[in-house]
Each structure stands twice: as structure tokens, then as C-alpha cells.
Amino acid sequence: MTATLERRQSVSLWERFCGWITSTENRLYIGWFGCLMFPTLLTATSCYIIAFIAAPPVDIDGIREPVAGSLLYGNNIITGAVIPSSNAIGIHFYPIWEAASVDEWLYNGGPYQLIVLHFLLGVASYMGREWELSYRLGMRPWIFVAFSAPVAAASAVFLVYPIGQGSFSDGMPLGISGTFNFMLVFQAEHNILMHPFHMAGVAGVFGGSLFSAMHGSLVTSSLIRETTENESTNYGYKFGQEEETYNIVAAHGYFGRLIFQYASFNNSRALHFFLALWPVVGIWLTAMGVSTMAFNLNGFNFNQSVVDSQGRVINTWADIINRADLGMEVMHERNAHNFPLDLASGEVLPVALTAPAVNG
């Protein structure tokens, strides 16, 4: 008998670390994107909680009139927010070490940039982590493609829009009422309701909700009963079972007769792809719309587009919306300027027709 001795292969610490990071056997998959995702999201979350509770007022408009957003300064859950960085900072990168002191950094709204930039890095890494885990499990990549829609939307309102407007003070505040304020001001300045891409986004979100409700109710109504009348139908399903849990033929026949034949899918895979595609494309288009309006390519303007034979304006809903927009714009940053830009930017009126003679 011959005995063969082989030298044991030594595995370096780095190789063991790589194996642990990319292992799909972990209860929570980490992945290389996770190495960036976990610290950035933890940083953003920690700073957000602290700032929402205790951040001092921020000079958002850059006119030495601080706005309080935290709970300890008199706000509640509805009115509280992390106030965007000061207009005095503009679009400049403003980390802690760029300020003369922590007090100055807080006064100028530094936490907003810290939270937003770490959050965007974190959600982008989460999207990459979805692709990475799908790749390691041999799955198709559609999960990360679908998640790219909310990532694009967040990037549009937190990064692209401030860049286009020239200041992080124009970004969306991190709070409930601040979000509503952002929406009203956005409508006032860009007429987003009349932008085709926003219309597509509304169709995507509401259409996706409708299709989801229709699909869920159809499936629930056509479940194959595996239990008695005294038990919940949910007990008739076993996780991982191979047979269908609902009768797609019955659901197809019902919906085809309710609407018309070709309104109903007869292919389960095509149906679920459509359910994913519709809202994702809608949110993609909305993010594109916000990103173009960031550079003032605004919604359609049909103001005073209907006149009578005498040239007098016949008001339409477009004119009523325009009047509402002007009212909202007047209320926005009311101490930073006297008039909205639409009212202040008229034709230049000459004050002096000739230059005065100066006798020296």
C-alpha cells in the first residue's frame, strides 16, 4: 500500500474574507456592493435621526433668517424636517471640514448634504447588491432594473434638481410638510402638472396600483381550494409546491368576459413582466421630467391661448392654474425677494432718454 502526502493548501486571510463577503449561505448577503451600502446607509440614517431631533435652525435662503426643522426647536412629526443646505453655500460641496466650526456647519445646513449624498450612494449600492446577489444565484437581473426607478427618482429630487437650480437649498426637505412644500413650489416654478413625463408617471403609479389590485383580486378569487370550508384557503398552500395555486384559465376567462378577450393575459410570465414594467417606466419618465425641469425646460404653457374676435382673453383652466402658480410663487421665500420672477421680469422701461452731461 502506498501513502501519498500532500501539502495542505493555505488559504490567506484575504481569500477567506472574499469568500465570506460573496457567500450566498450567509443569512444576510453582504456582497462587494454591501461593503459600500452598509456604512453609507448607516451614516445617513444616524445623521438623519439626530438632525431631525436636535439640529439647530438653518439659514436656508442665505439671508440670515434661520428656519427651524427639528423636534427640539418646536416642530412635530408632521412639520419637522432636515432643512436643506443654505443658499449661501449654493451647489458647493460642504463637508464638516470645509466649515470654520461645527456651529457654522449646522447653521448652513451641512447635515442635509451629508444625509443626501450618503443616502444616494447607499441606495445605488443596494441596487448593485441586488444585481450581485441575482448573478451569484443564477437569476435574471430584472430586480435591480426595477429598483433603478426609485433610485432615479431620488437622484432627481435630491441631486439633479439642486444642480440644475444652482443650490442645494432648492432640494427637497427631508420631512413630511417639507415634501409638500417642495411639490407646491415645483408646480409654481415649473408647471409640472402640464409636463408629459409627469403625466406618464401619474399613469405609471396609479395604473400600477390598479393592475396590482386587479391581479391580486383575480388570483385570490380563483384559488384552487385545498381545505375545508371551516379553514382558511391560505392553509392550502405549501411553500415550494410545484402545482399551481390558482386557476389562471378561470381568471383569464372571467376577465376576458368582463372587459374583452384580449384585455386578459393568457401567459403568466408576460403578465408579471407587464406588472413590473408599467410602474417602472412611468417612474423613469417622471425622474427624467424632473431632471429636465431642473434646467428650466418646464411644462406646457397654454396661458391666454384662447381669445375672442376682439382679442380679449377667454380664460381657460390653464389661466386658472397659472394664477394659482403665481400665488404659490409669491408665498415661496417671501423674505428673499419681493416678487416672483415671472412678475419681476417684464420689459425694461427707460428711465432717462439721454445721459446727463457731467461738467467737471
Curated annotation (Swiss-Prot):
Cellular location(s): Plastid, Chloroplast thylakoid membrane
Site, Cleavage: residue positions: 344-345
UniProt keyword terms in alphabetical order: Calcium, Chlorophyll, Chloroplast, Chromophore, Electron transport, Herbicide resistance, Iron, Magnesium, Manganese, Membrane, Metal-binding, Oxidoreductase, Photosynthesis, Photosystem II, Plastid, Thylakoid, Transmembrane, Transmembrane helix, Transport
Residues binding chlorophyll a ChlzD1, per UniProt: 118
EC number: 1.10.3.9
Assembly behavior: PSII is composed of 1 copy each of membrane proteins PsbA, PsbB, PsbC, PsbD, PsbE, PsbF, PsbH, PsbI, PsbJ, PsbK, PsbL, PsbM, PsbT, PsbX, PsbY, PsbZ, Psb30/Ycf12, at least 3 peripheral proteins of the oxygen-evolving complex and a large number of cofactors. It forms dimeric complexes.
Function: Photosystem II (PSII) is a light-driven water:plastoquinone oxidoreductase that uses light energy to abstract electrons from H(2)O, generating O(2) and a proton gradient subsequently used for ATP formation. It consists of a core antenna complex that captures photons, and an electron transfer chain that converts photonic excitation into a charge separation. The D1/D2 (PsbA/PsbD) reaction center heterodimer binds P680, the primary electron donor of PSII as well as several subsequent electron acceptors.
Protein name per its UniProtKB record: Photosystem II protein D1
Organism: Phaeodactylum tricornutum (strain CCAP 1055/1)
